[in-house]
């Protein structure tokens, strides 16, 4: 898009403003896009490379499948273990079972019901399934009461042991203080006794106590 205006003598130059305007209009309409120094349509690629974030694979959540039979077996095993522990603790720390028939009768009734349910006929399976929740509830109550009794007894014994330890530490502290006081008193009595013995020996040997004359220092003028 180069053009110039020359003198009027030159016939090849533009002589009218209309011709100049027409020439500028044609040049503006027919100009090439590559002639622009800063074209608008050119996309400048970015120099920074695109980085993809590393995706950590997610672990599938483990699904636990528990059947009704497995749950019932686990509950029965837990009940048997608790009943055995309760029998051991009652035999060691409580009077004979004749003095406390209530708990023994309940435990025996629960075990008898469980045995009856386990030895039932095939025709009465549905009835046994209906009665099992009631038996489990009763056994759970007995187990809960036994556990609560054992926990209360343990808490009481722990408190008694702590109190006894505190009393022992206080008694030992008092005994050490008394020993120190007695030792100090004995040492004082011993020193006073030695002084009296020395004065007695002086009186026996010389008949009177020694008189020590102190020399008086005179100041020289």
From Swiss-Prot:
This is Late transcription elongation factor OPG110. Induction: Constitutively expressed in abundance during viral replication. Belongs to the orthopoxvirus OPG110 family. The keyword Cell inner membrane does not apply. It holds the Pfam family Pox_Ag35. It comes from Variola virus (isolate Human/India/Ind3/1967) (VARV). It comes from the Viruses. Residues 25-105 are annotated as: Disordered. The gene is OPG110.
């Amino acid at each position: 898009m180069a053009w110039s205006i020359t003198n009027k003598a030159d016939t090849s130059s533009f002589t009218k403003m209309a011709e100049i305007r027409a020439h500028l209009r044609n040049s503006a309409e027919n100009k090439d896009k590559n002639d622009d120094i800063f074209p608008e349509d050119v996309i400048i690629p970015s120099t920074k490379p695109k980085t993809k974030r590393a995706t950590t694979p997610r672990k599938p959540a483990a699904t636990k499948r528990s059947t009704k039979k497995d749950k019932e077996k686990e509950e029965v095993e837990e009940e048997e273990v608790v009943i055995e522990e309760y029998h051991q603790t009652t035999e060691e720390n409580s009077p004979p079972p004749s003095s406390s028939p209530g708990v023994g009768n309940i435990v025996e009734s629960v075990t008898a019901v469980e045995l009856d349910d386990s030895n039932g006929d095939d025709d009465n399976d549905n009835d046994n399934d209906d009665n099992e929740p009631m038996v489990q509830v009763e056994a759970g109550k007995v187990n809960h009461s036994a556990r609560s009794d054992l926990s209360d007894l343990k808490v009481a014994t722990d408190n008694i042991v702590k109190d006894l330890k505190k009393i022992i530490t206080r008694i030992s502290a008092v005994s050490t203080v008394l020993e120190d006081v007695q030792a100090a008193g004995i040492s004082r009595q011993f020193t006073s006794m030695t002084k009296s013995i020395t004065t007695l020996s002086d009186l026996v040997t010389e008949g009177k106590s020694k008189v020590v004359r102190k020399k008086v220092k005179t100041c020289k003028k």
